[in-house]
Design a protein with these regions (language model features):
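Outer membrane pore-forming secretion/assembly proteins and partners of Gram-negative envelopes
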Residues: 18-155
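N-terminal signal peptide c-region/cleavage motif recognized by signal peptidases
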Residues: 13-15
């Protein structure tokens, strides 16, 4: 009877170690200033979505009697999917960062409409990391440097 219980405990222990979680941490900076960071623990192969946005309302059209109001979504959206393979951790991820640069107003007939101008950063790729390794992805455009940093650790 004791042997049976030890076999059951050993089976559960093996299952628990096979289902170890992976801790993923990300950070996005622009010219050295932190724009956003995200951290999660998840199981092997499980996608974790990420969303840190604000809605900015703006006048998008209409007529004199009725103005059409729309929402501009600014901030960060994305997801991470870690996979373990031997001693490595493969992480598939995407990130989309949008910021409002300015919102000029223009007269259109008898109404005023807003014209949001945005900028941002977009990255989608898969990276192979060793346990605990940190990787940086740099992008330089028009004097603006974005750095996206990602790391993954088996728990």
């Amino acid at each position: 009877m004791k042997a049976f219980f030890f076999a059951v405990i050993a089976t559960f222990a093996a299952s628990a170690s096979a289902a170890d979680s992976i801790h993923v941490t990300t950070e996005l900076t622009r010219n050295g200033e932190i724009l956003d960071s995200f951290s999660t623990s998840t199981a092997n192969g499980v996608t974790v979505p990420y969303r840190n946005v604000q809605l900015i309302k703006y006048r998008d059209g209409g007529s004199k009697n009725k103005i059409k109001i729309s929402d501009l979504e600014v901030g960060t959206t994305g997801s991470v999917t870690p996979h373990t393979s031997g001693n490595s951790i493969s992480v598939s991820f995407n990130i989309n960062y949008v910021e409002l640069k300015r919102m000029p107003t223009e007269k259109n007939g008898d109404i005023y409409i807003d014209q949001p101008e945005t900028a941002g950063y977009l990255l989608k790729t898969t990276v192979m990391l060793t346990n605990g390794e940190k990787r940086e992805f740099r992008s330089l455009s028009n004097g603006v440097e974005y750095v996206y940093t990602i790391s993954a650790t088996r728990n």
